[in-house]
Structures are given as structure tokens and as C-alpha cells.
Amino acid sequence: MLYYVGRFIGWIYLRLLYRVKVHGAENIPARKPFIICSNHINWMDPLTIGTSFPASYRIHFMAKHELFGNIFSSWLFRKVGAFPVNRDNADYSAIKTAYRLLKEGGVLGLFPEGSRSKTGRLQKAYNGAALIAVRSGVPVVPVAITGPYRFCKPVHLYIGVPLVLPPLVYDSKDEKKEQLEEMSMLIMESIGRLPPLSCPERHS
């Protein structure tokens, strides 16, 4: 109940103050599960995404563990479907939670860059989103958010065509890492193709 009440209030707040406009809603998959991968420019991005997809698609966001630092905030974030991740280490507990939610037919919200971009430009992604997408086999829905989040200045949310990443085929840890980095780049390129962003540069 709290999720849907908060979503309704958030929908009104964002549409009145920031005139959020959604583009590409026809690309939203008709069936769950799937993973939403978005750029990250503002702390309100999860709310913008959550109110731009159908209410029946409750989105579970992976959020930095610092937000769960006290009893009240931990209770609140868990109630709205978020779960913690330690960004400083390989958090296998968070990855297991992500797998479980997808196996149960849920929708997962991820910011592959790991933190907000101060410039608005796309940053290099961590490999966690690609790993979860490959291991679960569910489609990735690319999302791009642009706009200043200032009063009456439009914020635009673009939804791209879903993509399914190929399976991993490797003989060593180095090959696995290389393939995950390539797939992470594919995710970021799918976000970067949404106007008016640009893809992060590839590094050889």
C-alpha cells in the first residue's frame, strides 16, 4: 500500500513541478520479469522511473547501503521495494536478492554507473548489471533521463527497445571479465543511443 500511495504522490509532484515527459512507452515489455538500466543524474531518478512505468510493474531498485543506515530509513526503503548494495565490494548478497526478485517475476531497477553523474554525461558502467542480466537471461530495458530537475523545466524520460545479452562463454577469469565489460558497454551504448545522450567512449 505504501508503495502505491507514494507512487501516486510522486507522480503528481513530478508532473506539476518538473513536467516529466515520457517517450517510448511502447517499448515497455508486456511481460515481466525484466531489468531497467538507466543513467543516473539526480537522487529523484528512481521516483521518475517508478512513476513512468505502469503501476502494476512494481520496480525494485538496488540502492546504496548508506541509505539503510537507521531503522526508519531502512524500513521505508524496504517498504517501497528497494534493497541495499555495498558499492565498495562485490556484494553477493545483493546479487542473490536481484536473482530472486527476477525469478519471482519482478522488475529490477539498476543504475549501471553506480553513482550520479555530476556532468550529466554517461560514465563507464560497473559489471554488476551485465552479470545479473546475463545470468538471469531476462531482457534489459534501457532508459535515459535528461533535464535539470528545476521548477517548470521539463525532465524527459526515454525508454528504448529491450535487449537480451548473449550468454557468457569463457575459459578463464580474464575472459569472463572481458566479456562482462563488453556487455556493460553494450548496455551503456543502448542508453546512449536514446536522445540526447551520447555513448561513453570505448577503452581498448
Regions found by a protein language model. Give the residues of each.
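Helix-enriched interaction subdomains in cytosolic or periplasmic regions
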Residues: 1-7
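Short gly/ser/thr-rich secondary-structure transition/capping motifs
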Residues: 15-23
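Non-catalytic C-terminal accessory region of glycerolipid acyltransferases
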Residues: 94-204
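Short, basic, glycine/proline-bearing loop/turn elements
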Residues: 10, 79-84, 112-115
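Catalytic core of membrane glycerolipid acyltransferases/transacylases, capturing the structured
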Residues: 6, 15, 29-89
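Glycine-rich, highly charged phosphate/nucleotide-binding loops
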Residues: 21, 90-94
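A short, basic/flexible loop-to-alpha-helix module at the beginning of a structural domain
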Residues: 25-27
